[in-house]
């Protein structure tokens, strides 16, 4: 049964070997000539170890010009390093937009399907969106820089010089091929031929391949005079033909010595046989809708048309095999080499096995020549197992392990291989392909797992990838895209991600607040602003602290700050102390609801400014304005009691205004009542006495009494 392990596996979902593995050795290049005295090892970002290599300080010579130590990052991962860190970041940022668009479309289609949309329309629309998503990702994984084409093509160049593809793109195309792309179901074998022609170079790192044979032969090609006399010439052509690389085979055939002008006269029959085989190869039937320009073969989109074309083509091969011209061909290598190629085109299993180098190439050759109508994964998996037995290998390439998992419809193996060999990015993004074409994958990925805290596999792998992103300073800001798509634990981890960011950096904080705004996390943004405000205040940046606490609308913290500020001002309010906190008062503004007790300082600042205008000899209007501010201060509950008497003493000029009384009876009684409250408060423990002298207090009382009498007379 697909997806189940054998009895010998002990019941594991994914087979696990208990054999001891050889320890992995990581090179450490630190570049110090002197002996290492000490090592310090700590975790870096992601799977990086930060190794600090230190010299012996006692043996250090300042004149040797060598540094005292080096810090080296060692990456602990199964990746082969074919993709550099900048390329990984480009892929990470480039995949955000397609991923977010697909999630948005998923939500839209899900809403429509609950209303009017039929299931068939839903599946069709979703498949189109997944394919568009896959094409965007595949374009992102392609090499952005292509090598320029040569101005003059070398006639003996068999393999084009191109930048080596990546295993990540090869794995993505395999996932797309078998899970998402429904248009290629009828010509799946041909798609595998195309896949192998592009990525056989990757298999060369761990397997003997046809590509490596061609590459080695091309190096020797320049020095060969009579190419048809070399057995490797016929060997590489048979190998290339077995996997459908027709253009290479035809080009190599045209390098045959019988095509040279000085040879045509006495090698006419030999040349005719070579040309006949070349024509048959170029006319080979292909079960596919179309071919790219420059590719050989006759395409047939429908099975009946392909069968007719193939029968006619095979009859031509049989007719050529029985031709009498073979007897007239005097060149032994040419005769045997061409006949071997005819056997390959007929589908001789022994010839196909001899021509291929590994089981994947043998698998593709069988699909191309023996089983071109293979569709189901069951048949392909059975054929792949036979090919593996026919051409066993000690170590299997990661792409081939992934292919075996796909053909075996073993979703657990596919996920395990993607995670182990291609990293968390691959699993998080390929999950959409896996669930698009596999019912088993859909169930496995979206089934809630108790052992995972109630989340499903899809959410788990997105959380893992988001954690990788958040561990790096250059990618943390795109982690919220993936966390927001996780319904169960995403928002909680997103909140933790914001709390981990350095609050002392305003740009980082503003970026976090913007992300919170996008995802409507107002509670989180308020906490972030509060944390930042407290941090700035404690580290002496009082203005920034008050600003962020105001933005967070935290009245409690602002009240505490107000008390601290009052304590720092002291028992009296002088012009010198006013200058120290005047900037903070300016920052507070007039929003007393969110300023706590600091509202008093704002009002006092305005009162002092008005009083200064009065002392400068301005008009009566300035004096009235100063009185209004004084009354407002004395009425305000935010004005501390210990400041009442200093305020009245500062206002003696207003109380003793020579022309008329500036305070009416009610206002003067208010001031006298405040003095009475101060007299009673002196009897309580903990009262803070003013620094004013008794004479100053008497002056205030006399001024208020005089002003009260004048006010009575004026109002009568």
UniProtKB/Swiss-Prot annotation:
Keyword Protein transport: yes
Annotated S-S bridges: none
Superkingdom of source: Eukaryota
GO biological process: mRNA export from nucleus; protein transport; response to abscisic acid
Stretch forming the signal peptide: none
Keyword terms, alphabetized: mRNA transport, Nuclear pore complex, Nucleus, Protein transport, Translocation, Transport
InterPro entries per the UniProt record, alphabetical: Nucleoporin_Nup85
Gene Ontology cellular-component annotations: nuclear envelope; nuclear pore
Coiled coil: none
UniProt entry tagged with the keyword Nucleus: yes
Cellular localization per UniProt: Nucleus envelope; Nucleus, Nuclear pore complex
Subunit-structure text: Part of the nuclear pore complex (NPC). The NPC has an eight-fold symmetrical structure comprising a central transport channel and two rings, the cytoplasmic and nuclear rings, to which eight filaments are attached. The cytoplasmic filaments have loose ends, while the nuclear filaments are joined in a distal ring, forming a nuclear basket. NPCs are highly dynamic in configuration and composition, and can be devided in 3 subcomplexes, the NUP62 subcomplex, the NUP107-160 subcomplex and the NUP93 subcomplex, containing approximately 30 different nucleoporin proteins.
Physiological role: Functions as a component of the nuclear pore complex (NPC).
Record-stated family: Belongs to the nucleoporin Nup85 family.
UniProt protein name: Nuclear pore complex protein NUP85
Taxonomic source organism: Arabidopsis thaliana
Gene: NUP85
